């Protein structure tokens, strides 16, 4: 639990390393939430097709490169044996999660939601460690609570405020594999919302209450509380398709860039290790540039190759939706499949460094 609160920026004008992407993440979500709040008052509505286009722009063009960057940055300066095990574990995770969708799509969707919560939550807590400290989170259960609340905003809040759209897209996602399984989403949705909203609300109150009581006056609690409430407001006010599509590039990725800028990972370098990515650190600029290009190409081919395999194996790749809506559903499934090992292997099992490394 790193404590850098003494270097903490103010809420809007940080001074620590990584201050620019941190500020961008906050102002972006604040501006979007405010814009949609004003828009609703003026009777403005965004067509679903436009929302889908924004989602694809955010998740494919803006956010996908950062996911690859996280892995390559984590694997740089690591031994070849570790890199090999990492890649194998990653591919096994992808295969297992992909198989779950074909066998039990509803369970797969449930796990996908859990992965999104975990990625946003635990990745967020790690960025807090590096950027403004977490001295108000004094125990491991309290850190988990913070992660669930922050990550829960990504999925739970849209379920509460954008219920119809959330369930409609969930139905399309399930229909990619088995349209008959959609019936499992039926039932008393109003009661589910009540239970889900009550439970999440209690967790938010507990998180903020404990943080307030254990705050040490360094500013970390105030920053955490403000960001938590901002996330909740953002996902409540911004249409869910746009909200999710822009959250990952504008918030998650931006804050991980800020974390990377704020920490020094040179101490974790295995000086005597020889790995598959050593050429990236070559003294010869031409060789380093060529290696970077090769990594980009290999990563792109591998990613879209996996997407192509999923597309070809899926009984109904667009889930019965239109082109844009179907692509949003398909890409959401694909991203969740590759995100599972991203979180489990890259974030949790790699205890030496990991994609969210903070010394």
UniProtKB/Swiss-Prot annotation:
Q: Which compartments does it reside in?
A: Cell membrane
Main location (coarse class): membrane
Stated EC number for the protein is 1.13.11.63
Keyword vocabulary terms for this entry: Cell membrane, Dioxygenase, Iron, Membrane, Metal-binding, Oxidoreductase, Transmembrane, Transmembrane helix
Q: Identify the Pfam families for this entry.
A: BCD
- Could you provide one GO biological process annotation from this protein's UniProt record? retinal metabolic process
According to Swiss-Prot or TrEMBL, what is its membrane topology? Answer: Multi-pass membrane protein
Chain ranges passing through the membrane:
27-47, 48-68, 87-107, 108-128, 154-174, 194-216, 229-249, 293-313, 320-340
User: How does a null allele present?
Assistant: Cells lacking brp gene display a 4-fold decrease in bacteriorhodopsin levels compared with wild-type, whereas bacterioopsin levels are normal. Moreover, the beta-carotene level is increased by 3.8-fold, whereas that of retinal is decreased by 3.7-fold. Deletion of both brp and blh completely abolishes bacteriorhodopsin and retinal production, again without affecting bacterioopsin accumulation, and the level of beta-carotene is increased by 5.3-fold.
InterPro entries from the UniProt entry: Blh_diox
Q: Which GO terms describe its molecular function?
A: beta-carotene 15,15'-dioxygenase activity; carotenoid dioxygenase activity; iron ion binding
Q: Which cofactor does it need?
A: Fe(2+)
Q: Which reaction does it catalyse?
A: all-trans-beta-carotene + O2 = 2 all-trans-retinal
Q: Name one GO cellular component term.
A: plasma membrane
Summarizing the function annotation, the protein's role is: Is required for retinal production and bacteriorhodopsin biogenesis. Probably catalyzes the cleavage of beta-carotene at its central double bond (15,15') to yield two molecules of all-trans-retinal.
Q: Which family does it belong to?
A: Belongs to the Brp/Blh beta-carotene diooxygenase family.
The protein's name: Probable beta-carotene 15,15'-dioxygenase Brp
Lineage of origin: Archaea, Methanobacteriati, Methanobacteriota, Stenosarchaea group, Halobacteria
